[in-house]
Amino acid sequence: MSCCNPCLPCQPCGPTPLANSCNEPCVRQCQSSSVIIEPSSVVVILPGPILSSFPQNTVVGSSTSAAVGSILSCEGVPINSGGFDLSCITSRYCGSRCRPC
């Protein structure tokens, strides 16, 4: 039994909401009750170091040397092993925004 009438949903910008919501308060009276929860014991075993050493000048995801990194570029800006700005890469894939509802 619902305590309030469902509100009219606005047109969502993105995924459809799973449920409608209302702004008016929903009041239900319940009897007093108590619940005791006893957690079970959990044993967590952490592994040792997976990579004991990792070369600093290796291009991640490649088996070639860091010299190849100067060939890679994003919108004409060379990408090298010294770190680079991801903004030009992410703007290409994440730059589009939802239109307003």
Curated annotation (Swiss-Prot):
Q: Name one Pfam family in it.
A: Keratin
According to the UniProt record, list the residues that bear N-acetylserine.
2
Look up keyword Cell membrane and say if it applies.
no
Q: InterPro entries, per this entry?
A: Keratin (IPR003461)
The UniProt keywords, alphabetically, are: Acetylation, Keratin
Q: Which domain of life is it from?
A: Eukaryota
Q: Which GO terms describe its molecular function?
A: structural constituent of cytoskeleton
Gene Ontology CC annotations of this record: intermediate filament
- Acetylation: present as a keyword of the record? yes
Stated family: Belongs to the avian keratin family.
Q: Which PANTHER family match?
A: BETA-KERATIN-RELATED PROTEIN-RELATED
**Quaternary state and interactors:** The avian keratins (F-ker, S-ker, C-ker and B-ker) are a complex mixture of very similar polypeptides.
> What is the recorded name of this protein?
Feather keratin Cos2-2
- The scientific name of the source species is Columba livia (Rock dove)
* Taxonomic classification: Eukaryota, Metazoa, Chordata, Craniata, Vertebrata
